[in-house]
């Protein structure tokens, strides 16, 4: 059967005597052409059709390059054709009522990107919340997926992504559960300078100028009270729901992973989050989102990993208790924990998780736990202490008073961390105690 089709060239491969051109209109197909065309060109191809697996191909007899105006028309038609679902949010807070229309806008962007076959990079943070968000977003469109072990989108990350995006069609970078902080701005600025569109889905306190560099989906845009409790994984699930994907079963896993109380969750939700955190620790072994999903759906493997994770946490409790040092200041108890005596690099649990073990031991008190190592100081603030102490505010003061010793820092009001120059942890700890 002969077919004539007009579309935007989104990918080019060279196979023997032909160039295989992937073209996008409202659908995608391949054109076998003896002539080369650049990614982004609009062509009209005419020829006989054939199937390669499930992919329709046109073996071109004629190929004509079209005008730039045609390209704009195709993009506009695709955008007009895309519809998203207008679901009620799963969590019915004032923040979500305001955020949900913006989640639908992001959903539409992603569906349009899928129809246009845009080159997409998805980076998700290496914890239960970030992984849940990554699973939700990756269900919407094809993307190169990377686990991000740092809370910062660095200049190095940006240069890696810029290099990967070279010669690809309308590149798009999506960051989930990280990338909104001040330290990420330099990396985001490079993406913008190279013309790469960026979407950041994050629930951490953001840099003031984040929206100059990215489409920013965040609860912080709609008020600070309880903003961080609206986890990035949950927000990503709402984006996926607007695209017709159902990941409601992962909402409480995301909340449990970040100890958010917006919905009540069961021990099973905590266990799922624990398994994801356990797996994320070993990301150097090439974990993928598909792997995380498969583990959650294989009962024997899931139970084995859950047992190992719980055993490791239980075995550390006595060591944590023995290494906690106690100080008092203005009615607040400050617990200091030397993490280098307990943590093993590259092994579960992480320094943050070990600090949380100490926090769980004292969470009923008016207390702050400061876990420290050669390069990090980790904050955990109990509910009672949080009435007077804000971890993020302390970090900002430390950044101002000792900028030469601080590499980065931030997080939530009751759970945050500082990265410091090696060997200065004692001096910075004393500064923190003074501020408290």
Which positions does each model-derived feature cover?
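OB-fold/S1-family single-stranded nucleic acid-binding modules
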Residues: 48-77
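An N-terminal, well-structured beta->alpha segment
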Residues: 68-123, 139
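Structural detector for short beta-strands of small beta-barrel domains
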Residues: 1-15, 45-47
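N-terminal small/polar loop signature for handling phosphorylated ligands or for N-terminal nucleophile
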Residues: 111, 119-120, 126-129, 139-211
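Glycine-rich, acidic loop segments that terminate in or are immediately followed by a histidine
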Residues: 337-436
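A structured phosphate/pyrophosphate-recognition subdomain
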Residues: 115-120, 127, 210-347, 356-375
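Beta-strand/loop nucleic-acid-binding surfaces
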Residues: 24-39
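Short aromatic-glycine-enriched beta-strand elements
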Residues: 14-22
């Amino acid at each position: 059967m002969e077919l004539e089709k007009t579309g935007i060239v989104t990918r080019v491969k060279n196979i023997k005597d032909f160039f295989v051109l992937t073209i996008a209109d409202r659908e995608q197909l391949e054109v076998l052409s003896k002539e080369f065309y650049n990614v982004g060109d609009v062509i009209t191809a005419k020829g006989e059709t054939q199937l390669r697996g499930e992919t329709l191909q046109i073996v071109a007899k004629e190929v004509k390059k079209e005008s730039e105006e045609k390209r704009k028309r195709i993009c506009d038609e695709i955008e007009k054709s895309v519809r998203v679902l207008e679901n009620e949010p799963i969590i019915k807070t004032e923040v979500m009522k305001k955020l949900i229309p913006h989640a639908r806008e992001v959903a539409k962007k992603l569906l349009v990107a899928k129809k246009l076959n845009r080159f997409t990079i998805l980076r998700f943070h290496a914890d239960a919340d970030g992984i849940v968000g990554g699973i939700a977003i990756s269900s919407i469109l094809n993307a190169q997926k990377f686990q991000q072990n740092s809370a910062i989108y660095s200049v190095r990350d940006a240069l890696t992504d810029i290099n990967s995006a070279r010669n690809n069609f309308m590149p798009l970078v999506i960051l989930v559960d990280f990338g909104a902080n001040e330290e990420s701005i330099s990396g985001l600025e490079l993406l913008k300078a190279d013309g790469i569109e960026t979407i950041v889905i994050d629930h951490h306190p953001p840099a003031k100028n984040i929206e100059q560099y990215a489409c920013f989906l965040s609860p912080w845009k709609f008020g600070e009270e309880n903003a961080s409790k609206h986890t990035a994984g949950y927000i990503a699930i709402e984006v996926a729901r607007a695209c017709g994907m159902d990941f409601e079963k992962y909402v409480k896993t995301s909340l449990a992973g970040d100890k958010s109380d917006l919905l009540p969750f069961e021990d099973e939700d905590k266990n799922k989050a624990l398994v994801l955190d356990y797996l994320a620790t070993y990301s150097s072994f090439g974990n993928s989102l598909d792997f995380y999903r498969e583990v959650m759906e294989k009962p024997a493997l899931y139970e084995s990993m859950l047992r190992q994770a719980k055993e490791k946490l239980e075995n550390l409790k006595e060591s944590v208790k023995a290494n906690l040092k106690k100080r008092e200041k203005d009615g607040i108890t400050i617990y200091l924990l030397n993490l280098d005596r307990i943590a093993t690099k590259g092994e579960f649990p992480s320094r943050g998780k070990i600090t949380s073990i100490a926090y769980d031991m004292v969470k009923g008190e008016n207390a702050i736990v400061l876990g420290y190592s050669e390069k990090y100081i980790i904050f955990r603030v109990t509910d009672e202490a949080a009435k007077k102490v804000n971890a993020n505010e302390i970090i900002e003061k430390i950044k101002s008073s000792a900028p030469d010793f601080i590499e980065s820092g931030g997080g939530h009001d009751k759970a945050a961390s500082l990265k410091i120059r090696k060997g200065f942890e004692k001096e910075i700890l004393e500064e923190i105690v003074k501020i408290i």
